[in-house]
């Protein structure tokens, strides 16, 4: 220190000014570097965090080829894996019917006992016949909605943004059984089990309501607005908040079991969790507004890995374990890509350009992952193993598809479309413009004849079966299309709910 003072005293005033400026610049660089390290750490990889192949994502019994299943809640199962393991549902498809509405359907329907139930953005509840698309009943029960209902024993349980409420509605005819005013708006798709309805709200509360009358069993205040729907595994609810924390809450009594410090144990900075988490393999997976997807230990909250994309990740993560691909998580990003990442290590397996920004959930049905682009207004399907595009349909914005293991139901901007798998044999069909993996009606008879000939062992001479790879087939963008995401800051829809701003950025998600 004395030597430094001696040097300082020997300097001229001009030299002192220069030295002070250099020292200040160095100090700013060091502080900024330290801040960036805390605020924007590099991707984390912790191989010591527990991982189990015995927990979730494909461990439910695979449906028999001719058996339908019920998709009773957003995300399919209690862990919100967004994965239905069925061998039947794969392109090519034929269109069965299309129902066209007027308002945005931001969150996908649920499918129960031959009926589809959903709520549009204007709070209109709709029940459709799953075999025909015919409207069974339609009622406006709110003025603003952005969530899916949940079904349990003949009743639909739901929330709304305006008014701030929870509802129980009879599935048969839409009769309201009870209404519960909430302390703040909610777009948290409910989870119903053990006689309770679990939801979050913008006051930062996670609530358990009695399904018989809507009375509050418990409420727990978290670190910020809770917009995602909670996921469940082994007696615990998992949900992120707008304070940038992932939370584990005991379902029985609302006790907070663990809460990450901002973006994970030992990580500084903060981003918003809009993404509804998926719980599988002993881990919790969720996307964040800091452009990353995180994997946490479900028992302790310890961070296992983080994976950076080029823009916001509002997209809900799908977790699947299928033959040939192994445990993998799939998600979209505002950077216009869909990603497949090793569920254990966080290493990228593939990425594919989606042709637009993805805000809604990635959803896996069979061996295809589906995503919708709100800036491209389309729905795509990618092969789980390779990321190759096998399906395209020129409609879609947020929640892409659900299925009853016999039919695929696609959510367009304001429509619902039913697709049935079709055996084309060796017939090479031509798709309509903007589509891939969909056999046009005029060619379906030839396709069926080719399939019968194949079954009898007769060659058709039409060459190998096409998946719609002809003129007019939508081949999609090149792999790794990382065009500007530019989603802008947080969502907003006038004075209603927060959404990404207009001008190609679209509305705020689903998760």
Predicted region positions:
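Blade/loop signatures of beta-propeller domains
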Residues: 46-49, 58-95
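Extracytoplasmic beta-rich repeat domains
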Residues: 97-111, 135-153, 160-163, 176-193, ...
């Amino acid at each position: 220190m004395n030597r430094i003072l001696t040097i300082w005293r020997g300097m001229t005033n001009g030299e002192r000014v220069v030295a002070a400026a250099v020292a200040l610049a160095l100090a700013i660089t060091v502080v900024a570097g330290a801040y960036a390290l805390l605020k924007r750490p590099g991707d984390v990889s912790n191989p010591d965090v527990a991982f189990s192949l015995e927990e979730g994502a494909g461990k439910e019994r695979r449906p028999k080829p001719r058996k339908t299943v019920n998709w009773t809640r957003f995300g399919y199962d209690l862990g919100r894996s967004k994965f239905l393991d069925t061998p039947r549902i794969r392109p090519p498809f034929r269109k069965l019917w299309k129902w066209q509405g007027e308002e945005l359907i931001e969150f996908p329907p649920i499918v129960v006992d031959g009926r589809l139930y959903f709520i549009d953005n204007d709070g209109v509840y709709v029940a459709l016949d799953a075999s025909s698309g015919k409207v069974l009943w339609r009622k406006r029960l709110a003025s603003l909605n952005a969530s899916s209902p949940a079904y349990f024993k003949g009743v639909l349980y739901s929330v709304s943004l305006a008014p701030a409420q929870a509802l129980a509605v009879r599935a048969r005819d839409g009769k309201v059984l009870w209404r519960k005013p909430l302390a703040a708006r909610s777009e948290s798709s409910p989870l119903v089990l053990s006689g309770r309805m679990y939801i979050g709200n913008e006051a930062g509360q996670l609530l358990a309501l009695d399904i018989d009358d809507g009375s509050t069993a418990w409420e727990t205040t978290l670190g910020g607005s809770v917009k995602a729907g909670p996921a469940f595994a082994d007696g615990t609810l998992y949900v992120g908040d707008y304070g940038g924390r992932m939370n584990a809450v005991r379902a029985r009594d609302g006790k907070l079991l663990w809460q990450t410090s901002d973006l994970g144990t030992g990580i500084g900075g903060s981003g918003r969790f809009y993404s509804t988490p998926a719980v599988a393999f002993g881990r919790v997976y969720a996307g964040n507004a800091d452009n990353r997807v995180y994997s946490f230990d479900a028992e302790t909250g310890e961070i296992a890995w983080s994976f950076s994309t080029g823009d916001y990740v509002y997209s809900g993560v799908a977790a699947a374990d299928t033959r040939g691909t192994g445990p993998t998580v799939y998600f979209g990003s505002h950077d216009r890509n869909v990603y497949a990442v090793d569920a254990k290590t966080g290493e990228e397996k593939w990425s594919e350009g989606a042709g637009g920004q993805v805000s809604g959930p990635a959803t896996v049905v069979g061996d295809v992952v589906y995503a919708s682009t709100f800036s491209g207004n389309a729905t795509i399907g990618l092969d789980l193993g390779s990321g190759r595009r096998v399906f395209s349909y020129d409609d879609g914005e947020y929640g892409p598809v659900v299925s009853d293991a016999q039919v695929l139901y696609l959510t367009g901007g304001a429509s619902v479309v039913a697709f049935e798998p079709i055996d084309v044999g060796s017939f090479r069909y031509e798709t309509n413009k903007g589509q891939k993996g969909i056999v046009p009606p005029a060619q379906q008879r030839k396709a069926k004849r080719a399939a019968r000939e194949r079954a009898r062992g007769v060659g058709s001479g039409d060459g190998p079966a096409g998946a719609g790879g002809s003129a007019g087939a939508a081949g999609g963008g090149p792999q790794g299309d990382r065009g500007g995401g530019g989603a802008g800051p947080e969502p907003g829809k006038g004075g209603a709910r927060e959404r990404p701003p207009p001008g190609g950025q679209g509305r705020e998600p689903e998760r």
